[in-house]
Amino acid sequence: MNPSNNPKKTRHQSHMPQERDETKKEKKLLHRNIERQRRQEMAILFASLRSQLPLKYIKGKRAMSDHVNGAVSFIKDTQTRIKDLSARRDELKREIGDPTSLTGSGSGSGSSRSEPASVMVQPCVSGFEVVVSSLASGLEAWPLSRVLEVLHGQGLEVISSLTARVNERLMYTIQVEVNSFDCFDLAWLQQKLIEQLVLSTTRH
C-alpha cells in the first residue's frame, strides 16, 4: 500500500500547518502584550521622573530623551550644590569645635558660649537640610522644639532631626522634605529662619 494514500497520515499532516500558525499567533500575541505592559511601565516611570524635576529642566521639552537629559543636568547641579554647601557646613563645624580658635585657657568656655547662634540651609537628596548651632543653655539658647516650631510655621515637613553637643553648644541637623526646589529660595529661607528664631528668643 502506498504511504501517501494513508488517510490517517494525510489528515495528521494537514493539521500541522494550522497548529504552527496558531503557535505563531500565540507568540505574537504574548510578545505584543509584554511590549504593551513594558510601554505602560515606562510611561509611569517617566511621569514620576517629570514630577520630581524642577520646571526649568523640562520646560518646553516633550521628548523622553530630553527629560532624561534634564534629569542628568538636575542631578549634576544638585551634586554641585550639595558639595559646595557641605564644605561650608564642615567649615562651620570646624570653627565651632576647634579649640585653637578659643582665646585663653580660662576664658575658652566663655568665648565659645558667647558666639552667636547660626542657621545654615542646604539641599540634600530628599529636600534640604537645616543645620542650627545654638548655645546649650541660657536666655539665648534655641531649644530644638523652638526650631521645629519655626519650621512648621513656614509650612515645612520635618522628616528627621539629630542633636549633637559640641563645646557647650547644641547643633541640630534637621531634614526637611520638599517636592521641588523651585518652591524655595534657600537663601531667603535661611534668613527667614534666623529672623524668626531671634524674634522668638526676644519674646521669651
UniProtKB/Swiss-Prot annotation:
Lineage: Eukaryota, Viridiplantae, Streptophyta, Embryophyta, Tracheophyta
Protein name per UniProt: Transcription factor bHLH120
Organism: Arabidopsis thaliana
GO cellular component: nucleus
Coiled-coil regions listed in the entry: none
Cited InterPro entries: bHLH_dom (IPR011598), HLH_DNA-bd_sf (IPR036638), MASH1/Ascl1a-like (IPR015660)
Source taxon at top rank: Eukaryota
Region (Disordered): 1-27, 93-116
Assembly and oligomerization: Homodimer.
Subcellular location: Nucleus
UniProt main location, coarse: nucleus
Classification via PANTHER family: ACHAETE-SCUTE COMPLEX PROTEIN T5-RELATED (PTHR13935:SF106), ACHAETE-SCUTE TRANSCRIPTION FACTOR-RELATED (PTHR13935)
PROSITE patterns: BHLH
Single GO biological process annotation from the record: regulation of transcription by RNA polymerase II
Domain bHLH: from-to ranges: 26-78
Keyword annotations: DNA-binding, Nucleus, Transcription, Transcription regulation
